[in-house]
Amino acid sequence: MDHKGFKAIDSLRKTRIIYPIIVGCGFILYMLYKEFDPSIFSNISFGWNSIFWLVIAILLMLMRDIGYVIRLKILSDGEISWLKSIKVVFLWEFASAITPSAIGGTSVAIIFVHKAGLNIGKSAAVVMATSLLDELYFIIFFPLLFIFVSPHLLFDVEKYSSNILLNSFYWFAVVGYCIKLIWVLLLGYGLFINPVGLRKTILFVFKLPFLRRWKKNAYNAGADIIFSSRALRKKPFIFWFKSFLATAVSWTSRYWVVNTLFLAFFIVHDHFIIFARQLVMWIMMLLSPTPGGSGFAEFIFKEFLFDFINTDPENMLSYAVGLAFLWRLISYYPYLIIGAIIFPRWLRDNFNKSTK
């Protein structure tokens, strides 16, 4: 592959794979050193119950990926095969894992979808629709939480102010939610009201250094972008219902992973509150400047969920640190590993031909 082709996917270079691993593992090691007491785990019996719930946690992550694959099939009108859809999902998650949470892998995902068989215009429309559905999940469910869970239960974490207006977690969530809401409004406007404006936005994105190789293609695909956006507007209600249902299954499965990790070691009663706090956690993680939320995610987990650990108060933080590491081990690091394996081959298959 020539230098120009490599530069186009420079955002996924090896150093960006290593960086989140160093940050995440470094923060975990720091927490282990400061707050972890391995002797307390001698009182935990690791038996078939633990194995069962850990297997369920892994299956829930698989369910999450299956939901994403089904959604991609729906949004692409079945033009992308099942195998290619699976590859795109894992490549997309890999890109998200090595970029800051606020950025995600959206820009590069357009290339992944395009190389799976769609034109650039339709690829952009599919990726934008995917982003819209993801954010819509948070926009809808976050306000609904307050119907079933009081703000006191959501944000009243020990060591932090019980006054919600003085609680830093509350303001993290509010700012994150406002950012998501603004993005959904802009994206919805572009997809369903002003596709020409969406086209201009996509062209601006393709001026980024690592996407500049496709700038000319993006200009030529202007008509495709407008056509695809109009096509999405004409989709029937059932199309969007199935797409959003797949989205909801994916995100909900991801959140239940933590519940199963708690069940593997403790007796848990407040499952819905744990689920609700995770949704809030992911909104707060939008503000993380680190790739994949590395470090910040572990910190939020430890601080935001430790009081649900059913053990002696003096041992809660030690258990929380261990669970935070196990959580990321199941829900984050596998995407780095899988992506690091399949990305080089994807690179060879899709770019070597253009250099011969």
Question: Where is each model-derived feature located?
Answer:
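Predominantly cytoplasmic-facing regulatory/coupling regions of multi-pass membrane proteins
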Residues: M1-F90, V157-W282, T311, G322-F325, ...
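Hydrophobic/aromatic residues within the transmembrane alpha-helices of Major Facilitator Superfamily
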Residues: L62-M63, I98-S101, L136, A248, ...
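Membrane-interface alpha-helices at helix entry/exit sites of multi-pass transporters
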Residues: K84-V88, S101, T106, G117-L132, ...
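Extended non-transmembrane interhelical loops and adjacent amphipathic helices
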Residues: F90-A116, K216-I226
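Transmembrane alpha-helix interface/packing and boundary motifs in multi-pass membrane proteins
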Residues: W92-S101, L279-E298
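Membrane-embedded alpha-helical segments of transport systems
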Residues: A95-T99, K122-I147, C178-I182, M284, ...
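Interfacial segments of multi-pass membrane proteins
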Residues: F112-K122, R277, M281, F299-Y319
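Transmembrane alpha-helix termini and helix-breaking/packing motifs in multi-pass membrane transporters
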Residues: F142-K159, A340
